[in-house]
Amino acid sequence: MSLEAIKYKKGRLEILNQLLLPHESTYEVVSDTEDGWKAIREMKVRGAPAIAIVGALSLAAEIYSKPFASSEELAEFVKQKLQYLNTARPTAVNMTNAVIELTAFVADLTKCSPKDMKQKLLSKIEGMLSEDIAQNKAIGKFGAESILGAVGGPVRMLTHCNTGSLATAGYGTGLGVIRSIHEMKQLEHVYCTETRPYNQGSRLTAYELVYEKIPSTLIADSAVSMAMKTKKISAVVVGADRIACNGDTANKIGTYQLALAAKHHEIPFYVAAPVTSIDFSLVNGDAIVIEERSPLELTSVKGIPVAASGIGVWNPAFDVTPAGLITGIVTEHGTFSPQEMKDKLLALKG
């Protein structure tokens, strides 16, 4: 059974505070969009799909018992709150897509009564949870089939950051692929990176792997090339925060160098993400906004300094992996090469 990072029922939203993992499993109540914004910004919840879901559900929690005099008032309230949520972390596109989708949804309901509009909006948002899990299971299935079809099995996998149940509504994207391979009894071993400086790999991915008893080993970020050379890695799978039309992919810092190392060692490199992570407005990855975070994330651990005082710090949270380094992009609709992804997915959308 996978971890449950997001709990929602009848206007009550709780999230597993990922800042406290792996030492403490504590759920915190998110009462409104201000709580939601802070949870996203402070990385109590992280992972592009989870950011969008928690953002939307924080809106649901806020409007659940709040009265509105008119449907126009509700629509304007929703629009402003969604725009605010979208400022919490700019690189992940899933929240932007949720903002566009939900804003358009309420705009089409202005002829409804405020009560009916609210109920339809709540149903729409609440459906995002089950929809995300279904998408993740499809991603897991297609990714497992693609990797096993390409390299055979059993396989030894390498992954970066956290792309499992803690980064989504459940099951996961990149880790969902690994989970699917494990369920098929074709996983020999998985190596996960520590993922400095926030240690999502050592704190979160390792936590999930141990929780589910998946054979696994934690390695330093700087050990990936050595692991590829000596540990017989079959394939690499990572997640994505934003994918451009040509396949350029923004993901957790360190992904780019991982892809370069995989290319050198002739190891297939896969990106696993729902279609909501694809930004069809971007021709390539050059225009992706890269979030830069506090220097303290590099210079201290739990408030204790670990770097020389006065040293300059550059702390980008993401990098962009060029499409030419990516073997395939796994979505809920199948696995596509970066070159074919845009046309095939747009054809599916009709």
Swiss-Prot record:
Q: Where is the active site?
A: 241
Q: Name one GO cellular component term.
A: nucleus
Q: Give the reaction(s) catalysed.
A: 5-(methylsulfanyl)-alpha-D-ribose 1-phosphate = 5-(methylsulfanyl)-D-ribulose 1-phosphate
GO BP annotations of the record are: L-methionine salvage from methylthioadenosine
Pfam families, per the entry: IF-2B
What's the top EC group for this one? isomerase
GO molecular function of the protein, one example? S-methyl-5-thioribose-1-phosphate isomerase activity
Q: Which subcellular locations apply to this protein?
A: Cytoplasm; Nucleus
Name the Enzyme Commission number(s) assigned to this protein.
5.3.1.23
What are the protein's UniProt keywords?
Answer: Amino-acid biosynthesis, Cytoplasm, Isomerase, Methionine biosynthesis, Nucleus
- Identify the residue position(s) of the site Transition state stabilizer: 161
Task: Cite the annotated pathway.
Answer: Amino-acid biosynthesis; L-methionine biosynthesis via salvage pathway; L-methionine from S-methyl-5-thio-alpha-D-ribose 1-phosphate: step 1/6
Q: Which family does it belong to?
A: Belongs to the eIF-2B alpha/beta/delta subunits family. MtnA subfamily.
Spell out the NCBIfam families in the cross-references. Answer: eIF-2B_rel (TIGR00524), PRK05720.1 (NF004326), salvage_mtnA (TIGR00512)
What role does it play? Answer: Catalyzes the interconversion of methylthioribose-1-phosphate (MTR-1-P) into methylthioribulose-1-phosphate (MTRu-1-P).
Name this polypeptide is given = Methylthioribose-1-phosphate isomerase
